[in-house]
């Protein structure tokens, strides 16, 4: 039997495929979500947004994951906005791109991925 977390990872990849998303953005405390999404080899970029430099370095070893350091933040929608802005800054996303964002709430607790959001990148 698969756990609920695995269902979220598979659904994230399926949603990205169905919407022809440019990227999957995973806001992650430990990097686990980004690593688990990478095992499904989605056909789009995986951007692992971490709050810790050590986690970013570890994500460099995961297939298809592009790590971005966000720094600490405990408000989920502020983190999402910072993640989108960092991706635009680094040339990974531009206006009109569809993204699938995943995270756990409450922020900062490993193993709690329970949120999936589809967002079209604005200006």
Task: Please describe what each predicted stretch is.
Residues 1-8:
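Short, small-residue-biased leader/transition segments that mark boundaries at the very start
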Residues 10-24, 28-42, 47-98, 104-123:
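ATP-dependent carboxylate/acyl-activation modules
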């Amino acid at each position: 039997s698969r756990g609920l977390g695995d269902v979220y990872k598979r659904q994230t990849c399926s949603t990205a495929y169905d919407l022809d998303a440019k990227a999957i953005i995973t806001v992650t405390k430990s990097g686990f979500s980004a690593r688990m999404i990478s095992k499904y080899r989605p056909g789009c970029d995986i951007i692992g947004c971490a709050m810790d430099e050590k986690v970013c370095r570890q994500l460099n070893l995961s297939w298809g994951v592009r790590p971005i350091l966000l720094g600490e933040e405990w408000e989920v929608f502020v983190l999402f906005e910072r993640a989108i802005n960092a991706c635009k800054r680094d040339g990974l996303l531009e206006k009109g791109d569809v993204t699938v964002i995943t995270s756990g709430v409450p922020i900062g607790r490993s193993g709690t991925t329970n949120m999936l959001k589809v967002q079209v990148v604005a200006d």
